[in-house]
Amino acid sequence: VGSEMCIRDSACNLLGLEEQVLDEKKSQIAHGETVRETANMVSFMADVIGIRDDMFIGEGHKYQKTFMDALEEGYRDGILEQRPTLVNLQCDVDHPTQCMADMLHIIHYFGGVENLKGKKVAMTWAYSPSYGKPLSVPQGVIGLFTRFGMDVTLAHPEGYEVMPEVEEIAKKNAAATGGSFKKCNDMKEAFKDADIVYPKSWAPFKAMEERTKLYQAGDKDGIDALEKKLLAQNAEHKDWACTEEMMKLTKDGKALYLHCLPADITGLSCPEGEVDNSVFDRYIVPLYKQASYKPYIIAAMMFLAQVKDPVRALMEMDKSGEERKMF
């Protein structure tokens, strides 16, 4: 994805790192190279490795864990002089860089982390003309926002459930921080008096499990049949959209609208989609601010993992008084 690559490039540039992109379709991975081989081969001179693997339920997070196990083994056996940091750029379970950027945005918007407790968040499904959007954003949001004492509602039509183990994490987080986590099948109920709304499409968890099995079996006809079924299922819920009327239900009619971008915008990018053009356009400035935090989140993850005393290092850089030079 073009914008995602630019964000990663920006994060690396911020730290003076040079980025190399591995396209598995053009590598030995496509010819049977194992995870253990790949992990060691790409790590000889690498300080940080970022992996994005979000398309197949049950595989993305597992791949990253297997990759890290191989790095540990390579470092322990003396193959690697250093063990690179792994940054999860997105997997089937979570999208940490996106969700932490979302969190940083709302911390700034509401004037501090201490002001988040008790804020109502509506993480809702929304209609899209496509069917296979990852579950990692809604799962990441309910897993992270409940850690800050917020009242999080996950809303979706019946059949669009997320991974049950992530729901359990959200429940435990809410109980530990004095917030709440609840589910419903009514978008209006979720939007009512919400301080923050995050309407976004995602694919049903069970259907994505089935799709993974079909791809593993090489069942093209089965994949095509599943796609038609899911598109038809989506079309039954076109009323799940962030409209002007829906926004009026939120707190004072002025809830903060979030989206990880790109959004399916009704009347602009598609005939019917996740959000009305007028709503999206009204929130364009805060949306771009939300997106702007992502390269800093990625850079911070790399910096914190690579620098032994990050606080001292940052203080020394601040004392130097050097500014970024523009040429």
Model-derived segments and spans:
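Short, small-residue-biased leader/transition segments that mark boundaries at the very start
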Residues: 1-7
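Phosphate/diphosphate ligand-binding glycine-rich loop within oxidoreductases
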Residues: 8-107
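Short internal alpha-helix immediately C-terminal to a glycine-rich phosphate-binding loop
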Residues: 98-124
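Short, conserved loop/helix-junction motifs that constitute active-site signature segments
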Residues: 115-117, 146, 245-254, 282
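Conserved anion/nucleotide-ligand pocket segment
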Residues: 121-156
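Rossmann-like adenosine-cofactor binding region
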Residues: 172-276
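Adenosine-phosphate binding glycine-rich loop
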Residues: 250-327
